[in-house]
Amino acid sequence: MGVEHELVVVDEFDALSIELKRPNGSSSSSPSRAVSVEKYPAKTHARKVADKLGVDKGLIYLQGKPTTTYEDSDMEPPFRQRRYFYYMSGADFPNAHLTYDVATDQLLLWIPTRQPREELYLGRIPSREDCMSRLDVDDCRDVVQMTRFIAAHLKHHPGTTLFLLHSDQAPGLDDLPVQYAGRRLDIGRLRLAVDAARVIKTPFEIRQIRRANQVSSEAHRAVLRQIRHLRTEADVEAVFVAACRVRGARSQAYNPIAGAGANAATLHYVDNAAPLKGKQTLVLDAGCEWDCYASDITRTMPAAGRKFSPEAQTIYRIVEKMQNACIDLVRPGVSYLFIQATAQLVAIEEFLKIGLLVGDKAKIAASRVVSAFFPHGLGHHVGLETHDVRSERLLGYDKSSAALWRGKRLVMSVEQCDRVAELMVTARQQGADARDALAEGMVITIEPGIYFNRQYIEAFCSDVPERGSFINKSVLDRYYPVGGVRIEDDILVTADGYENLTTAPKGEEALRIINGDDVEADAVLV
């Protein structure tokens, strides 16, 4: 059945709606971005931060992202607001600042103004009235008055600490009282407090992340509908980004990964340029932002044709089983590291069934050979960042391990692999007070993957020759052409379990869409 469509303006902000015309003359519209009347809960977030700071007085200062240009250029990069500032303000435009007086609970947003000539070139920025109507702040004031305000506040409240995020983001206070020199400036505690506040999402934040997931899931669905007609990884990326854009999502949460065949075995592959023909799998790891809040979704599909090869189907089913087992464990108090161990244990059991691994299961677990195929952490927090604050804590890392982060996935250290191996052998759940325990209001990813990266597998096994003794090389050779399989959903931890925020099709549902059995296919533009 044919369906006509047209783009129409639905409000004064020029939001676009996809108008669907059906043969009977009826129509339906899906606004790409409706005008929200709900204020951003800046005050709620500020109070959470103050609570985590554990103080009853003090002045918090945060600086928004200033206008910048590329190095040796007069061209501006796409604007991306500083996330710590956005969390406490909701202001998504450059050159703004905020102050929060803990004692009086006063949250002020300091905003710039543009002269008519600047507006001619750059357009207008939100006015005081705009900000007051959309953001839950006590007042919006002209930024030119800010330094005078802060200096006066510190002068008249000599016992007050000024909390800063970074030393290079301090307000320029020429008349800062001498007695403050190095003694009442706190640089360090604010970041920890904001991190602690951000890790548990407010209802507003959950709605934003859910919306980002809805848009991204529809974009993944659009790719599934068209994948048999696409020729390159670039085509896949283009379809996904376009589908997000027409639904009102202006930015991607991270650079999309569209890797086919061997490229699917590169965790952070972003070239997205190779042909799809002749490849067994396509890993599409892509998610949009909605008002600065991220989604993070991965789906694996046949790169060409209507179905997986037998080998790719086998690996897909294993990863699917890994993910289902892990998601079923999500609830408050559960150790995330234990969930990671569960994923690896499922992989070992399934590898033994297909003959990829041979030997005693306990010895295989202790050898950590499964990390040759599943080398990364199971997931991370999602929020204002794709890899949101405190994600390293999910796998028991401390700040000294920050260098182990590589993009969206954590490189498992030897120590962490040993801890996971111990959990696999003992099947022992850590206590609810563990630093990696889940809590209500967290949004995390569950993203197991299996990869056949020849160079990595050979190097991993050569480091400890015993590992290679557990791998059946002839079986392994059959699976190298698969490349890789990863499945990733965003999971909200609820009071008694979880809610899967991701609705992107996977498994048999995805294959039905690829094969044209999607009953909704004629009612969507992209």
Swiss-Prot record:
Gene3D superfamilies linked to this entry:
Creatinase/methionine aminopeptidase superfamily (3.90.230.10), Creatinase/prolidase N-terminal domain (3.40.350.10)
Q: Where does Mn(2+) 2 bind?
A: 285, 296, 488
What is its EC class?
hydrolase
Q: Which UniProt keywords apply?
A: Aminopeptidase, Hydrolase, Manganese, Metal-binding, Metalloprotease, Protease
Q: Write out the GO biological process terms.
A: proteolysis
Q: Which organism is it from?
A: Pyricularia oryzae (strain 70-15 / ATCC MYA-4617 / FGSC 8958) (Rice blast fungus)
| Residues at which Mn(2+) 1 binds | 296, 447, 488
Q: How is the cofactor bound?
A: Binds 2 manganese ions per subunit.
Q: Which cofactor does it need?
A: Mn(2+)
Q: What is this protein called?
A: Probable Xaa-Pro aminopeptidase MGG_05684
**CDD domains for this protein:** Prolidase
Query: Is Protease included in the keywords of this UniProt record?
Result: yes
Q: Which family does it belong to?
A: Belongs to the peptidase M24B family.
Q: Which domain of life is it from?
A: Eukaryota
UniProt key word Metal-binding = yes
What GO terms are given for molecular function? Answer: manganese ion binding; metalloaminopeptidase activity
